[in-house]
């Protein structure tokens, strides 16, 4: 076993959890780019994650020496099963590209305007990022973008760490807010992206509706996973209840999508293009189901094994929650004005206002005193977000 390979239950759980979230991002990116090489890499990463989970299950079973131990270990195996289901679903999404099942061009256009967009850019000669480490570049806080992967020739580096160095000619695969796309392209020495052109010809209304539903299912799946892990880390039943709502919504959307796809088939130029929609929808629903499973212990008021909490605190993206205080910098300002993602690197999963939740609020969403923010991102960004939401404290005068 390599020195940097995870060795114990906690390390294996961290590696599997991080891999599951990366798999979701890469799978949808493979669909967006219609990239068979990237889809194949998703398959390889999923196999690696399966290896982590097999070792985790073996070590967890060996650690149970009493009925009390077994009850605690059961929660570890339960979470491992949910993570495994997420990986399987992501792999199913990638296989749509590998199997050439067909993806309508409307879907790729809509994915470019999803809550989080993916993109790729080649590093030009003399670019600002050339020869610099990711730690030095601080891309999440400077642009709001996370690097999913770096491709150098035919080699891929997934989920690159802070010591990874970007070189001229590298292809960066990134994800984040739409307003950050041209920021990272500028740093890579690439020209800005032009506004998306209007699609030619009158679109099929039934197909457009099916595509819109699928993009909503994608957004729901990504939010559900983030909220599920956050509910587990904070032992928060309110977050678990929101995951349940998202899972129920996903079931409804899946039924709706199947109906619209069947209606679109009669007018579609190539009905085979609709097969990919059905496969991606089923996989997206499966991700929501797995997210619901992750929240089971929180939902039922039972404490999972402490190693799960320890693992969640050590993952690459940290969960954070904070409340907007009266007189804070955040109060009365929109997310766009605060530039939360580009300034702090934190992605807002949800905002709770009273008893109502707003998932993945848009840039125009204005924060009010008392709003509870649930976000994910780098540890340094979590501290910056908290500072924005705290009212200035008067300095203590001399005694």
Feature locations, PLM:
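Cytosolic, long alpha-helical scaffolding segments
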Residues: 1-399
């Amino acid at each position: 076993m390599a020195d940097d390979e995870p060795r114990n239950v906690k390390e294996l759980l961290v590696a599997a959890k991080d891999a599951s979230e990366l798999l979701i991002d890469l799978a949808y990116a493979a669909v967006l780019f219609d990239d068979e090489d990237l889809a194949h890499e998703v398959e390889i990463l999923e196999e690696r994650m399966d290896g982590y989970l097999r070792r985790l299950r073996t070590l967890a079973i060996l650690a149970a020496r009493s009925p009390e131990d077994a009850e605690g270990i059961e929660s570890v195996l339960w979470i491992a099963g949910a993570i495994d289901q997420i990986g399987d679903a992501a792999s199913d999404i990638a296989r749509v590209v590998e199997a050439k099942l067909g993806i309508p061009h409307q879907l790729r256009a809509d994915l470019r305007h999803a809550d989080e967009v993916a993109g790729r850019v080649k590093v030009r000669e003399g670019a600002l990022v050339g020869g610099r480490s990711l730690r030095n570049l601080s891309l999440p806080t400077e642009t709001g973008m996370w690097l999913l992967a770096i491709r150098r020739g035919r080699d891929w580096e997934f989920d690159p760490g802070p010591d990874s160095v970007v070189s001229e000619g590298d292809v960066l695969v990134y994800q984040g807010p739409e307003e950050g796309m041209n920021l990272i392209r500028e740093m890579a020495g690439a020209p800005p992206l032009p506004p998306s052109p209007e699609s030619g010809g009158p679109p099929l209304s039934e197909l457009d509706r099916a595509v819109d539903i699928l993009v909503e299912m994608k957004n729901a799946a990504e939010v559900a996973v983030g909220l599920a892990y956050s509910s587990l880390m904070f032992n928060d039943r309110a977050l678990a209840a929101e995951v349940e709502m998202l899972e129920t919504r996903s079931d409804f959307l899946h039924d709706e999508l199947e109906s619209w796809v069947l209606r679109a088939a009669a007018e579609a130029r190539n009905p085979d293009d609709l097969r990919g929609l059905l496969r991606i929808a089923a996989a997206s629903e499966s991700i929501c189901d797995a997210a619901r499973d992750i929240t089971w212990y929180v939902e039922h008021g039972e404490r999972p094994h402490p190693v799960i909490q320890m693992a969640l605190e050590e993952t690459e993206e940290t969960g954070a929650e904070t409340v907007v205080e009266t007189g804070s910098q955040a109060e009365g300002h929109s997310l766009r004005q605060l530039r939360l993602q580009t300034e702090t690197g934190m992605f807002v999963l949800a905002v709770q206002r009273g008893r109502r939740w707003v998932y993945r609020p848009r840039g125009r969403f204005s924060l009010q005193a008392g709003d509870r923010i649930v976000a994910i991102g780098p540890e340094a960004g979590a501290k910056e977000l908290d500072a924005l939401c705290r009212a200035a404290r008067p300095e203590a005068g001399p005694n």
